């Protein structure tokens, strides 16, 4: 089967379920790719553009609105997963701790997880919480792809400069981490991220 033939139809994505606790997750079968990022980094917008379905993942001007793990089925066996946003100071610490425990359990125990897309606003990349999430995923041997979102907010030269700086910062992790520029506004990097997702989905268990 060719890569094209095996690529999921992202436009077929449909909301499946949400989970506030680990035991509420759907069966650990098939293949999942999860998206995670700081609140308002553009995670929901990225999911909407990748699938071509406006409003699939709810966007909000209020950071911290996504408080559960949301699952979107591409077909019977493949899913995209929207993990809770992090790093929003106005969310009570108790709530943040619950999110952290839920996400940690998901990353550590979810056997069908094929890869993690870490979404960062290109104007504020690699905050301490971003680095913590990357360390999490690296420790659990999860492939990581970084989206530097909102690249349209910077000039082309400035965006490339930031891309290079982040590449240098993550180089110690080796081939487990890849990154790219992305913009939900002008669709920069859309084909590139879809290619990464499709490669992960087609990888052996």
From Swiss-Prot:
GO molecular function term, any single one: GTP binding
GO biological process, one term: division septum assembly
Domain spans labelled EngB-type G: 29-203
One GO CC annotation: cytosol
SUPFAM superfamilies membership: P-loop containing nucleoside triphosphate hydrolases
Sequence positions that bind Mg(2+): 44, 66
This protein's UniProt keywords: Cell cycle, Cell division, GTP-binding, Magnesium, Metal-binding, Nucleotide-binding, Septation
Highest taxon listed in the record's lineage: Bacteria
Pfam families: MMR_HSR1
Family classification: Belongs to the TRAFAC class TrmE-Era-EngA-EngB-Septin-like GTPase superfamily. EngB GTPase family.
PANTHER family in UniProt: ENGB-TYPE G DOMAIN-CONTAINING PROTEIN (PTHR11649:SF13), MSS1/TRME-RELATED GTP-BINDING PROTEIN (PTHR11649)
The name this protein goes by in its record: Probable GTP-binding protein EngB
Record organism: Coxiella burnetii (strain CbuK_Q154)
